[in-house]
């Protein structure tokens, strides 16, 4: 590393501790960031990558002089232009935040006040810090709206948060951070919750804005393909320690550590599709659906899923993927068309279906923790369907719960834990066990890995594939991740604005010629190669000019 004086941000031997409260044990002190050092020059981007709990966000917040809830910075230096901000005190830190150092969170929706216009919120911190007059701040905001590619930049600031898309809201939050002309911005997973087609626009906008304003940035993510497009250097973190640190090309093309190699190689292999030699377990014929206000959300959708196979339903937010799952499960009645399961028509509404039909079709949700009662133990959560469908109680139910915990590779030691005591991956495994408890034939998987880190998600996918092979399960797997589609699917359905635009075996669905939307979707998936983002944007510009 170079001397700190030549860098805007210099972090040395950073140590951060927190107090842990393990169940049934006295509180204990744990180290969550251990001896981390790095430098960041003006106009450069350092990517921080690792799984949940690696310390990425904790380090990012420390660069703002902030110890997250329950955490304390107990050692090291964080120097901004040679000044150790950890020694400034509360008053000095307040003057920095929102002025020289800014933060862009993962959830832009949670960062904006729904009752105020976007333009007023974008300039608020800049005006409060008296860095510009309100008029100059509005001019700066307009310039940033243009740089970030927001629609109708002259009037964009007059909108409220609910009147713009998720991608537009994320760019508005970036404008808020850039408005005060800060020296440093911390981007904390700004594209994780976005669809691939939206993500590429936001990534391009952030990259362009950083270059235009010569701002330094820490870019936090668990997606190595994404960070490769925007960073100059990458730091790989695990359990609060630095695993590897170097130029992006070296990390991507010649990683030195086993853990980094595992991140680079995650989900490289594609599954060979099965041949349709079985009858369709599920058939959707010309199904349309609408909400109570008459808004049509599905338009004449027809597809089928063969027994023991996986049908991936792919598309961006609002495409109708989850609505299709709601119709299949009976949570939303179709306005026309029919759904048959193992050759028999399914009653449109859930409450009218026989209990055995309910048992045979189960759901696994995207956010496992919101689908579980936080006051129930794993024993209760998995045991509920055992009682509901099979009447199991007492020792018989406990024995079956233990069997299911072994099937999901967690072990019986978790049986009396609560959801809050589980990691994200463990919660999703419990959700899988709960679905298996009903002895289903079809499981609808609604983005079950989208909120998980790549290595954890890979473990969940491998578990699902193993269970499918052992129990001849059929999966309808909803996702917007083409890499997952390639890894697990036998057949693919592409949806766009409530319509089915492509359906067939994976080899056919993911091979040209493509319709325009499928082509866009496939080209928007970040690839683990340098310059991929620039190539995609250049291709888009050429195609746009040709049209």
Where are these predicted regions, by residue range?
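ABC ATPase NBD coupling module
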Residues: 25-26, 85-102, 128, 249-255, ...
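Helix-to-loop junction immediately C-terminal to a conserved catalytic motif
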Residues: 64, 68, 329
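Conserved ABC transporter NBD signature motif
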Residues: 72-84, 337-346, 502
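Conserved ABC ATPase "signature" region
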Residues: 84, 136-155, 395-413
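Conserved ABC ATPase signature
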Residues: 159-164, 168, 418-422, 426
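Conserved catalytic motifs of ABC-family nucleotide-binding domains
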Residues: 181, 439
């Amino acid at each position: 590393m170079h001397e700190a004086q030549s860098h805007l941000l210099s972090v040395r031997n950073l140590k951060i501790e927190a107090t842990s409260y393990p169940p049934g044990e006295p509180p204990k002190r744990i180290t969550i960031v251990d001896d981390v050092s790095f430098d960041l020059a003006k106009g450069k981007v350092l990517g921080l990558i690792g799984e949940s709990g690696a310390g990425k966000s904790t380090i990012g917040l420390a660069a703002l002089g902030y110890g997250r809830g329950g955490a304390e910075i107990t050692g090291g230096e964080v120097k901004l232009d040679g000044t150790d901000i950890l020694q400034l005190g509360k008053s000095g830190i307040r003057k920095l935040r929102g002025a020289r150092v800014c933060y862009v969170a993962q959830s832009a929706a949670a960062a904006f006040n729904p009752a105020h216009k976007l333009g007023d919120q974008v300039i608020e911190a800049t005006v409060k810090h008296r860095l510009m007059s309100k008029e100059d701040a509005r001019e700066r905001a307009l310039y940033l709206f243009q740089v970030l590619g927001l629609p109708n930049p002259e009037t964009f600031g007059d909108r409220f948060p609910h009147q713009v898309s998720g991608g537009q809201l994320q760019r508005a939050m970036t404008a808020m951070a850039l408005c005060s002309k800060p020296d440093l911005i911390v981007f904390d997973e700004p594209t994780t919750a976005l669809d691939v087609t939206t993500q590429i626009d936001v990534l391009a906008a952030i990259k362009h804005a950083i270059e235009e304003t010569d701002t330094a940035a820490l870019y936090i993510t668990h997606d190595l393909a994404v960070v490769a497009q925007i960073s100059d250097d990458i730091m790989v973190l695990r359990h609060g320690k630095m695993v590897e640190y170097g130029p992006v090309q070296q990390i991507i093309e010649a990683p030195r550590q086993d853990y980094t190699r595992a991140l680079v190689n995650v989900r490289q292999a594609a599954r060979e599709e099965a041949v349709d030699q079985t009858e369709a377990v599920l058939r959707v014929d010309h199904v349309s659906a609408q909400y109570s206000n008459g808004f049509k959300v599905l338009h004449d959708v027809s597809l089928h899923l063969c027994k023991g196979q996986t049908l991936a339903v792919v598309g961006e937010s609002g495409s109708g993927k989850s609505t299709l799952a709601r119709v299949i499960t009976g949570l939303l009645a179709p306005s026309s068309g029919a759904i048959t399961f193992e050759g028999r028509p399914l009653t449109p509404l859930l409450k009218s279906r026989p209990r055995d039909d309910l048992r045979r079709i189960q759901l696994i949700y995207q956010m496992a923790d919101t689908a579980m009662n936080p006051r129930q133990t794993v024993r209760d959560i998995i045991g509920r369907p055992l009682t509901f469908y099979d009447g199991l109680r007492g020792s018989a139910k406990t024995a079956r719960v233990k069997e299911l915990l072994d099937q999901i590779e967690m072990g019986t030691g978790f049986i009396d834990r609560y959801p809050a005591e589980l990691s994200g991956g463990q919660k999703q495994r419990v959700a899988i066990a709960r679905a298996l408890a009903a002895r289903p034939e079809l499981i609808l998987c609604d983005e079950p890995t989208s909120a998980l880190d790549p290595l954890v998600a890979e473990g969940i996918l491998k578990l699902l594939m193993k269970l499918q092979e052992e129990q001849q399960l059929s999966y309808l797997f909803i996702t917007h991740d083409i890499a997952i589609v390639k890894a697990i699917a036998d057949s693919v359905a592409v949806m766009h604005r409530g319509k089915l635009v492509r359906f067939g075996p994976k080899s056919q669905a993911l091979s040209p010629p493509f319709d325009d939307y499928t082509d866009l979707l496939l080209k928007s998936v970040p690839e683990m190669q340098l310059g991929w983002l620039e190539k995609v944007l250049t291709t888009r510009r050429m195609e746009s000019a040709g049209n």
